[in-house]
């Protein structure tokens, strides 16, 4: 009987990708099969996120909940950014943990587990071997018509509030050929949509063959768009400073490039942006957005926002709200500032009461929600091309998929549509999703906006 592994993922899409790779590595090396039931697992892994304190502390809370399973010989591992940041401190706080491994060493997980058995003591590997991880990963397993592909690791921007450069290391890009081989392999297995991943994905500079030349993200997108079977391309997460004219032009020449972009601005006050060490002004951000929407007028934008950064005044917050009103974001991920140990911002003086920060966050989220509802309502009556991902979460008898602009659509349709690109007429706008009607016959050209 095959051993089973339970993996709980915290945080970003890069962590989701890494969790899939953990499962692939364990299956290839030791025959583990994934399970969603922690009670039947032989191995429990937490793939962690340290971007915010709440997520970090939840890891230790979850560890406590599975501690009792050690009585029947279950092994427990902690990976991801908390593992990289805390290292041996995890073993000190939770001595029943068997292995601790960083984002760059997940490929060594089978070896670490073997060493745990042989040496009868916890194992820790949070080193940063440059790109070695990708050289030792098995072929990707396909679980649908969409897939993540990591094209680079780490970040070299060192924003004053962010732990990513310390937990995932400096930027390292995968060679161009390696990425293309992985995408082509996924397409051969039926994947129609790929999302290219990186902490700072548009800083990609992949080696081209044996030459000294480097491919940027714009060139990589050209190559990926030419791979047979790939019908839609996404990428995340972008940094405004790396948005080159070539990348902007890609939206004009590549119809396969999805009509959605996650481009975190973080704030709308130049003073706060400078304190964050973001490297751009609000005006420069809006200029990039204008250039993009000159090519794709209905381009859907989403962003991260940090409210209550140390020293944020009411005037600073008002500037943030003005930027939001001007840009009209389609979605957001907004949070109150969470000081992370070891970052410059953690030591900045902060005299803004927490209740004021919470009130500002609620105000921001209320405005964004109004934008989302307005955009959704404008889609009613349009025809949208979606990738059908599977059963609807609302009703298992129905299907769901995503539009070009990453909006979820639920609809009634035959099961054989799963994994296909289909056209739907949008019939209803709900809070954060759409409802559509399947157009079984050939329909008019689908609009790009949704």
Swiss-Prot record:
The keyword tRNA processing applies. [4Fe-4S] cluster 1 binds at residues 12, 49, 81. This is tRNA-2-methylthio-N(6)-dimethylallyladenosine synthase. Its EC number is 2.8.4.3. The gene is miaB. [4Fe-4S] cluster 2 binds at residues 155, 159, 162. Its cofactor is [4Fe-4S] cluster. It is found in: Cytoplasm. Keywords: 4Fe-4S, Cytoplasm, Iron, Iron-sulfur, Metal-binding, S-adenosyl-L-methionine, Transferase, tRNA processing. It catalyses: N(6)-dimethylallyladenosine(37) in tRNA + (sulfur carrier)-SH + AH2 + 2 S-adenosyl-L-methionine = 2-methylsulfanyl-N(6)-dimethylallyladenosine(37) in tRNA + (sulfur carrier)-H + 5'-deoxyadenosine + L-methionine + A + S-adenosyl-L-homocysteine + 2 H(+). Pfam families: Radical_SAM, TRAM, UPF0004.
């Amino acid at each position: 009987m095959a051993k089973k592994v339970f993996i709980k993922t915290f945080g970003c899409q890069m962590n989701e990708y890494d969790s899939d790779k953990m499962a692939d590595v364990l299956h290839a090396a030791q025959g583990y099969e994934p399970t969603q039931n922690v009670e039947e697992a032989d191995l429990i892994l937490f793939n962690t996120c340290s971007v915010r304190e709440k997520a970090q502390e939840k890891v230790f809370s979850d560890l406590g909940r599975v501690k009792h399973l050690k009585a029947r010989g279950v092994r427990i591992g902690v990976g991801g950014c908390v593992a990289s940041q805390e290292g041996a401190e995890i073993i000190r706080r939770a001595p029943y943990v068997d292995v601790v491994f960083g984002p760059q060493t997940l490929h060594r997980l089978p070896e670490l587990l073997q060493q745990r058995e042989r040496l009868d003591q916890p194992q820790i590997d949070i080193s940063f071997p440059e790109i070695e991880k990708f050289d030792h990963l098995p072929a990707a397993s396909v679980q649908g018509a969409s897939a993540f592909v990591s094209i680079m690791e780490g970040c070299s921007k060192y924003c004053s509030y962010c732990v990513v450069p310390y937990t995932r290391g400096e930027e390292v890009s995968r060679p161009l050929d390696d990425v293309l081989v992985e995408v082509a392999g996924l397409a051969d297995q039926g994947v129609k949509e790929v999302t290219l991943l990186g902490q700072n994905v548009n800083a990609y500079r992949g080696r081209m063959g044996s030459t000294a030349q480097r491919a940027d993200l714009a060139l990589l997108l050209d190559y990926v768009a030419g791979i047979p079977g790939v019908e839609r391309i996404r990428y995340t997460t972008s940094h405004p400073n790396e948005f080159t004219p070539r990348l902007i032009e890609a939206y004009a020449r590549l119809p396969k490039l999805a009509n959605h972009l996650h481009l975190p601005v973080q704030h709308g006050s130049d003073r706060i942006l400078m304190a964050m060490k973001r490297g751009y002004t609000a005006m420069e951000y809006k200029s990039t957005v204008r250039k993009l929407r000159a090519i794709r007028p209905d381009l859907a934008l989403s962003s991260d926002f940090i409210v209550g950064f140390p020293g944020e005044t009411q005037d600073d917050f008002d500037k943030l709200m003005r930027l939001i009103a001007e840009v009209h974001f389609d979605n957001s991920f907004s949070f109150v500032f969470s000081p992370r140990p070891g970052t410059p911002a953690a030591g900045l003086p902060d005299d803004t009461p927490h209740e004021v920060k919470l009130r500002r966050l609620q105000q921001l989220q209320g405005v964004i929600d109004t934008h989302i509802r307005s955009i959704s309502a404008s889609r009613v009556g349009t025809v949208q091309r979606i990738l059908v991902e599977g059963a609807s979460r609302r009703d298992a008898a129905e299907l769901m998929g995503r539009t070009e602009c990453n909006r979820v659509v639920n609809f009634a349709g035959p099961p054989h549509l799963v994994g296909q690109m289909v056209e739907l007429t949008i019939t209803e706008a709900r809070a954060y999703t759409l409802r559509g009607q399947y157009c079984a016959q050939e329909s008019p050209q689908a609009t790009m906006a949704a």
